[in-house]
Amino acid sequence: MEEIIKALQNNEIIIVTDDENRENEADMICAGEKVTGEMINIMAKYARGLICTPIGKNIARQFDLEMMVKNNTDNHETAFTVSIDHVDTETGISAFERAQTIRALADNNTKASDFRRPGHVFPLIAKDRGVLVREGHTEATIDLMKIANLKEIGLCCEIMADDGHMLRGKAVVELAEKLGMKMTSVSEIKKYIKENNLDFSKNEENFLEKTNIINLPTDHG
């Protein structure tokens, strides 16, 4: 298989599936720091789900992003913060303005006051130890960003079928082949982290000094 991490570093969209006994869903995922309007448009067109922006806790603290609700009763406790738009956007909803807002999260010069609340970008806070403690697409996204030495800001979007139901199984593989997207799974990411003794909570700054490109094996070739 061609490298998942290299694809993310090359600003490509990949597909990540989760466990059949969890959500049993597939998400399109990409890095946030260089995301383009064209990439968000691809997600909106071919994935069709809610485009969200997984972030690390440090990013949430940096921009004072509070939780959307105090009492989270979501089935999987998805950690939505208040939604945002960058102040330089107009309505904030276009693919290009959403990309502008997300790139601003990765800009060291951006301040908390540079975002309007609520908005059209939906940050999700990943747990510190990632998929080792929560096997969700939020954590998978941020774990992949860390492994790839990218900023802890990504995008994920659930993939729906033409009929509006969730795309699953062989149909996900067929879509990945059609769009030329690399594919992996949450379980494969978790296995890689365990095999390489990566504990993200111990050294958030430089836990991956050893490699820039990692060959991440998958069941999909």
Model-predicted regions and their roles:
Residues 1-221:
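Catalytic domains of riboflavin
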